[in-house]
From Swiss-Prot:
Chain sites annotated for binding AMP: T31, R36, Q57, L58, V59, G85, F86, P87, R88, Q92, R156, R167
Phylogenetic classification of the source organism: Bacteria, Pseudomonadati, Pseudomonadota, Gammaproteobacteria, Vibrionales
Protein name, as recorded: Adenylate kinase
This protein's encoding gene: adk
The keyword Coiled coil is assigned to this record: no
Gene Ontology annotations of biological process type: AMP salvage
InterPro entries listed in its UniProt record: Adenyl_kin_sub (IPR006259), Adenylat/UMP-CMP_kin (IPR000850), Adenylat_kinase_CS (IPR033690), Adenylate_kinase_lid-dom (IPR007862), P-loop_NTPase (IPR027417)
Subcellular location: Cytoplasm
Coiled coil region boundaries: none
Signal sequence interval, chain numbering: none
Family to which this protein belongs: Belongs to the adenylate kinase family.
Domain comment (free text): Consists of three domains, a large central CORE domain and two small peripheral domains, NMPbind and LID, which undergo movements during catalysis. The LID domain closes over the site of phosphoryl transfer upon ATP binding. Assembling and dissambling the active center during each catalytic cycle provides an effective means to prevent ATP hydrolysis.
CDD domains: ADK (cd01428)
């Protein structure tokens, strides 16, 4: 089962990725993790990536695609894998196709921008421990205070409205065209495209996914 997850930042991809991994026993392939592992291991591609990063540049699609090819050839990907955060652009999707990587399911989590802004704006974090809360969905016992230490909670810069809206802008510009791309692939019978309402409760979305993948 080879799956690609699509959805804006804050649409709940990470939560459902964990559910899919546990349920179907397939690894999540994160390009960030792969890059770090390749650099640490000192592989040929890792060395190339490190040189680019050290020069303050973006790692090319070619290097990322090479890393993905190496990663999915490993034993734990025999039953499939879950790609999260890749592809982000049409050229990357074309690159996967040219490499002969078949995709069984493309899963989109659909959430309106305003809902995402509200979700992110409600997040509160206790920075020393990494514990996170939400003023509506997962409030602390005492408003504005960490449950364990009683220390102040803060709004991370990443969760501030202007930052969230900027990230959503990039997503719509770069990644949203993939929705159309994979819609056409599905129409041609090359993959299955599944769209879920990301505003539902987490357990409901998980149940919907399980039913669709059965």
């Amino acid at each position: 089962m080879r799956i690609i997850l699509l959805g804006a930042p804050g649409a709940g991809k990470g939560t459902q990725a964990n559910f899919i991994m546990d349920k179907y026993g397939i690894p999540q392939i994160s390009t960030g993790d792969m890059l770090r592992a390749a650099i640490k291991a000192g592989t040929e591609l890792g060395k190339q990536a490190k040189a680019v990063i050290d020069a303050g540049q973006l790692v090319s699609d070619e290097i990322i695609l090479g890393l993905i090819k190496e990663r999915i050839a490993q034993d734990d990907c025999e039953k499939g894998f879950l790609l999260d955060g890749f592809p982000r652009t049409i050229p990357q999707a074309d690159g996967l196709k040219e490499m002969g990587v078949e995709v069984d399911y493309v899963i989109e989590f659909d959430v309106a921008d305003d809902v995402i802004v509200e979700r992110m704006a409600g997040r509160r974090a206790h920075l020393p421990s990494g514990r996170t809360y939400h003023v509506v969905y997962n409030p602390p016992k005492v408003e504005g205070k960490d449950d364990v230490t009683g220390e102040d909670l803060v709004v991370r810069d990443d969760d501030k409205e202007e930052t969230v809206r900027a990230r959503l802008g990039v997503y719509h510009e770069q990644t949203a065209p993939l929705i159309d791309y994979y819609g056409k692939e599905a129409a041609a019978g090359k993959t299955k495209y599944l769209k879920f309402d990301g505003t539902k409760q987490v357990a409901e979305v998980s149940a919907d996914i399980e039913k669709a993948l059965a």
